[in-house]
Design a protein with these regions (language model features):
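NTP/phosphate- and nucleic-acid-binding module
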Residues: 1-573
Length: 573
């Protein structure tokens, strides 16, 4: 049996107007519905309604993790910085890592993830293959000092995450754990009513060479992804690769210098030659992470992918300044591979490797080359995957055109391999008595992000439309005249009946106008509303409203409890 909550006592301060700084629907509606409040940039308090939904998401996560054989524990938020030095991540992570000294001058970090902590935890305990595999998880606040916190709960500095870590003796065992987690994450999304697409992803600072993200599709999502309707391939734009169809440039194959006055853009050059932008070559002057000059070249109609560029040029690479261009003898808008000044590394996109006729800058103001050919006219120092894949590019699996979408990352799985165990000396004895590093996987679910993703996918012009499984309350009982004895008695009867059925009920007993109550309840988004109106009570009926469909149905007072209980229990996941 559950206990009802009464809105006269509920702390849920709703807002009539949209907050000025709320960009996403989820941010706007969670603020307006009295569910979260901003304390500082990227820091939010979860008010009672949101916290109930958070706990439901956490419990769904626990159900699926436990069913997959994982074990829950709790590790400290405050982590000894020496562990991060052991792994080599303390500097690589950058300024997002919150670092501080305690009163004794010992350095600590606030954990954004816990690979180091869990590896240190098990390295003296998991010593034999007989103890493996093991999968450990916890649900905890995390901290990342985001440069630009935005989108409400989507990109905050403090957030709630479930992170799990598996330890295996063999690659085959890791694959089994990885597959279990992928299935668990698919189940979590389904039970939370999040429409999510598993996409190939970049492993980023966490590491490893295999990763999949679960992206909640949303027009206002922060991440870009591409997918194939034909074969099902999907990847985020940081990891997506393809074979771009490259057009050969104009000319007869002979290296020819052409005057192009004032034409310092791809668009202007393509128009001048009467050729598609794909037939030109875009040259970008960069400074790599070591401070050395680089020119990167990609097809003219594609952009340099920042994540891929970090893999090639190092984290912290950047575009050259105007002063640096002058220092290295380069001219903005007219940079190219032919006659490139000495000491500048040339890296070209892999898609250009087979192209033998380039239209590109001539490294001289107001001039371009046509017919430039790699190896004959210039030497490429490195070929690499550099471009951002876009809609219309061919699928790398089946060759059909890719589609593009935006999404919200709600969870991600990684095969870490031995990155952390080797660095931190976490080893075990195998069947042959040989000492080997533990083989690791890690698996994260953004719990607070999932809350925002649900709202992002489930809302309308009136407010949030909660799915039953994660709704703060499943049913709102709305007596329009709660001070009248008949209305109060019927309300008590229905509430007691629903609570006896285990239904989670909130009662809008506030002394407010009906229109105000309807608007507030629609904004808060409880899945079902039972409305007790004067006319209906006179006829022995109440109105049942389905918040998702807007459908209304008059039910006899003695039938409403059974009907609502049936609907709610069927919709729970």
């Amino acid at each position: 049996m559950t206990r009802a909550m009464y809105m006269s006592k509920l702390y849920a301060p709703t807002l009539k107007e949209d907050p000025a700084d709320a960009e996403l629907a989820s941010h706007r509606l969670l603020l307006r519905a009295g569910m979260i409040r901003k304390e500082a940039a990227g820091l939010y308090s979860y008010l009672p309604l949101a916290w109930r939904s958070i706990r439901k998401i956490e419990n769904i996560v626990r159900d699926e993790m436990d069913a997959a054989g994982a074990q829950e524990l709790m590790m400290p938020i405050m982590v000894d910085a020496e562990l991060w030095r052991e792994s080599g991540r303390i500097d690589a992570y950058g300024k997002e890592l919150v670092r501080f000294d305690d009163r004794h001058g010992r350095e600590f970090v606030l954990g954004p993830t816990h690979e180091e902590t869990v590896t240190a935890l098990v390295r003296n305990e998991l010593r034999s293959y007989k103890q493996l595999p093991v999968n450990l998880y916890h649900i905890q606040d995390k901290f990342r000092d985001e440069f630009r916190p935005r989108f409400g709960l989507m990109r905050g500095r403090e957030f709630i995450m479930k992170d799990a870590y598996s330890f295996s003796a063999t690659q085959e065992s890791l694959q089994e754990e990885y597959d279990k987690m992928k299935q668990a994450y698919a189940n979590i999304c389904e039970r939370c009513y999040i429409k999510a697409l598993p996409v190939v992803a970049d492993s980023g600072e966490i590491g490893g060479d295999t990763s999949v993200e679960y992206m909640a599709l949303a027009d206002a999502g922060e991440a870009s992804l591409v997918y194939c309707d034909d074969c099902g391939f999907a990847a985020d734009d940081e990891a997506a690769s393809t074979k771009v169809v490259v057009t050969e440039g104009p000319g007869d194959g002979t290296l020819t210098k052409v005057e192009t006055p004032g034409m310092g853009t791809i668009e202007a050059v393509a128009k001048f030659f009467g050729f598609p932008e794909n037939g030109t070559r875009k040259s970008l002057a960069l400074i790599d992470a070591e401070g050395k000059p680089v020119v990167a070249i990609v097809p003219g109609d594609h952009e340099l992918n920042d994540c891929k560029a970090e893999h090639v040029f190092g984290k912290g690479y950047r575009m050259m300044t105007d002063e640096e261009l002058q220092t290295y003898g380069l001219h903005k808008g007219f940079i190219g591979p032919v006659n490139l000044p000495e000491g500048i590394r040339l890296v070209c996109d892999e898609n250009l490797r087979e192209s033998k006729q380039w239209a590109c800058g001539a490294n001289e103001v107001d001039y371009h080359f046509t017919g430039a050919c790699p190896e004959r006219d210039f030497t490429v120092d490195e070929w690499a995957d550099l471009v951002t894949v876009v809609a219309g590019d061919p699928c790398p699996h089946c060759g059909k055109p890719l589609s593009a979408a935006r999404g919200i990352e709600v969870s991600q799985v990684f095969q870490l391999g031995t990155k952390y165990s080797e660095a931190m000396g976490a080893t075990f004895m195998d069947e042959d008595g040989k000492e080997k590093p533990l083989i690791m996987g890690c698996y994260g679910v953004g719990v607070s992000r999932s809350l925002a993703a649900v709202v992002e996918q489930h809302n309308d012009e009136h407010g949030i439309v909660w799915p039953v499984s994660v709704a703060p309350y499943e049913v709102a009982v709305i007596p329009l005249d709660p001070k009248k004895e008949e209305c109060a008695n019927v309300c008590d009867q229905i509430v007691e009946g629903l609570c006896a059925e285990g239904i989670e009920v909130v009662v809008d007993d506030r002394d407010e106008r009906p229109g105000f109550k309807f608007a507030d309840n629609d904004l808060m988004g409880f899945p079902y509303q039972v409305v007790l109106g004067k006319r209906g009570l006179k006829n022995g009926t109440v109105e049942l409203k389905d918040r998702a469909t807007g459908e209304r149905e008059d039910l006899a007072i003695d039938e409403v409890v059974a009907k609502v209980a049936e609907l709610v229990k069927a919709a729970r996941r």
